[in-house]
């Protein structure tokens, strides 16, 4: 389930109808009131899940079930996906693996061959998902005092996660703690105070808004520690470090730091066997990680 409200209180029968990508054209002359709507979406190359979810909600559907087509589905057909919903809790949404979708698709085709005009079957659905508002999460910080106490360098990563969260982003939390431990064990005394930040609510933190991610980092800077702006000279934020993703590594930064970072990147000796195309500098920063705050 996504961050939405839906309770069946046990198994409940629904009609499940497949509507392609869930666009307005695919709803034409189709009554989905009280039904489960099954769609295929590609959140990387087309649109986010909130658009087909809200479309289904406005049409009176009981809920929408999303299957990732390409994009986030490329790891494995059995993989489930979950991201932030960027929408209201009363528009329920669920995730289904491609493997399960292909089984259901076969059943729907058999029904169509039997005379049904729409790809539709009857299913039993059991769901319990509830959004509890005004709950607490905690950002965890530690400091290595520098000789200049008025300036800070942040090492940040988020510890909230979907599923096991090893890649996104617990491996990064271990990295920043390991960096801090190495500095302390080595007896290094920094000039700038080093602040290690394990941040909450990066994946999702506010209901019923398009901007529901990176909440923990935003509130750390603008609410919990409003004294930080003007004193942080850099934030080194770490995301998805456990898997290479590509043949080339990259440091993403603001425009102002691009030349400085590139000079550093040019001096890095890449370990043998990883990133055969080396490392580069990308800019500007993206909204999809805590450093944007």
Where are the language model's segments positioned?
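Metal-dependent peptidase/peptidase-like ectodomains
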Residues: 91-93, 101-102, 149-150, 199-293
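A non-catalytic alpha/beta surface segment that caps or lines the substrate-entry region
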Residues: 1-15, 87-142
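Noncatalytic luminal/extracellular "stalk/propeptide" segments of secretory-pathway proteins
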Residues: 1-36
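Solvent-exposed loop/turn segments at secondary-structure junctions
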Residues: 23-24, 42-46, 69-73, 100-101, ...
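Alpha-helical metal-binding/catalytic segments enriched in His/Glu/Asp
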Residues: 140, 151-210
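Structural recognition of the beta-strand scaffold that forms the well-ordered cores
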Residues: 16-18, 36-40, 63-67, 92-96, ...
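Loop-rich non-cytosolic ectodomains and luminal regions
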Residues: 32, 37, 53-121, 164-174, ...
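Loop/turn elements at helix/coil->beta-strand transitions in domains of secreted/extracellular proteins
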Residues: 15, 32-37, 59-64, 119, ...
């Amino acid at each position: 389930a996504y961050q939405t409200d839906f309770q069946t209180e046990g198994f409940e029968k629904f009609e499940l109808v497949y509507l392609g990508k869930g666009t307005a054209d695919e709803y034409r002359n189709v009554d989905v009131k009280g039904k489960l709507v099954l769609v295929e979406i590609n959140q990387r190359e087309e649109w986010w899940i909130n658009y087909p979810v809200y479309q289904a909600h406005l049409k009176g559907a009981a809920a929408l079930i999303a299957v990732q087509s390409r994009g986030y589905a490329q790891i494995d057909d059995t993989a489930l996906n979950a991201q932030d919903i960027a929408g209201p809790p009363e528009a329920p949404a669920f995730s289904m693996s491609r493997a399960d979708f292909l089984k259901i698709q076969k059943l729907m085709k058999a029904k169509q061959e039997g005379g049904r005009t729409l790809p539709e079957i009857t299913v039993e659905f059991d769901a319990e998902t509830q959004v509890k508002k005004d709950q607490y999460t905690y950002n965890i910080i530690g400091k290595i005092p520098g000789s200049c106490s008025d300036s800070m360098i942040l090492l940040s990563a988020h510890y909230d996660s979907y599923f096991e969260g090893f890649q996104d982003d617990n491996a990064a939390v271990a990295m920043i703690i390991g960096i801090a431990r190495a500095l302390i064990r080595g007896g290094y005394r920094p000039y700038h105070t080093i602040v290690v930040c394990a941040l909450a609510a990066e994946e999702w933190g506010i209901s019923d808004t398009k901007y529901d991610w990176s909440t923990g980092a935003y509130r750390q800077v603008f609410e919990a520690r409003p004294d930080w702006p003007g004193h942080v000279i850099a934030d080194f934020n770490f995301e998805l470090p456990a898997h290479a993703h590509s043949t080339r590594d990259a440091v993403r930064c603001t425009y102002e730091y691009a030349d400085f970072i590139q000079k550093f990147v040019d001096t890095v000796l890449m370990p043998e066997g990883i990133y055969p195309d080396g490392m580069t500098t990308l800019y500007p920063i993206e909204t999809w990680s805590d450093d944007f705050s």
